[in-house]
Curated annotation (Swiss-Prot):
Similarity remark: Belongs to the universal ribosomal protein uL10 family.
Protein name: Large ribosomal subunit protein uL10
GO biological process, one term: translation
An example Gene Ontology CC term for this record: large ribosomal subunit
Taxonomic classification: Bacteria, Bacillati, Actinomycetota, Actinomycetes, Mycobacteriales
UniProt gene name: rplJ
Source organism of this protein record: Mycobacterium sp. (strain KMS)
Gene3D superfamilies: 3.30.70.1730, 6.10.250.290
GO molecular function, one term: structural constituent of ribosome
Length: 175
């Protein structure tokens, strides 16, 4: 690879690091080209899966201000640069790794810090942002309905008391 090509590749990878909301670093030793294509399809629009030389990736990470990933760049390494929801991409990679034992998750990077294998797996086990927001909204709606019932209860109790007193007076006057 010519020096100019390397500089271009480093700049491209650094740009991907900067634009990504998260990255997942994997080892793809033993996977076929068809397997890699299948993984890329499963990631869809949420992430791009890139295979690059470790030395170029290390330089690009340093250029992008990413620290703590150098030890992950050994052996055949590929990186998923996540543009969408990190949970969706992590789920897709974890599911693919479960089917294809050759794919090994090495770690990742999100919100300014390196992630361990366990942290990437925990992110994959989370529900998507939309599901969590829906659950939160449902919980809030239920609590708001209870609060409205509590606030309305004294008024309705007063109204029932007034109606009972009115009936009692009407009964006393009739007698």
């Amino acid at each position: 690879m010519a020096k100019a090509d390397k500089a271009t590749a480093v700049a491209d990878i650094a740009e991907q690091f900067k634009e990504a909301t998260a990255t997942v670093v994997t080892e793809y030793r033993g996977l076929t080209v068809a397997n890699l294509a299948q993984l890329r399809r499963s990631l869809g629009e949420s992430a791009t899966y890139t295979v690059a030389k470790n030395t170029l990736v290390k330089r690009a990470a340093a250029e992008a201000g990413i620290d703590g990933l150098d030890e992950l760049f050994t052996g055949p390494t590929a990186i998923a640069f996540v543009q969408g929801e990190p949970v969706d991409a992590a789920k897709a990679i974890k599911a693919f790794a479960k089917e294809h034992k050759a794919l090994v998750i090495k770690g990742g990077y999100m919100e300014g810090r390196a992630l361990s294998i366990d942290e990437v797996n925990r992110i994959a086990d989370l529900e998507s942002r939309e599901v969590l927001l829906a659950k939160l909204a449902g919980a809030m709606k239920g609590n708001l309905a209870k609060a409205a019932g509590l606030f309305n209860a004294p008024a309705s109790q007063v109204a029932r008391l007034a109606a009972a007193l009115q009936e009692k007076k009407a009964g006393e006057e009739a007698a």
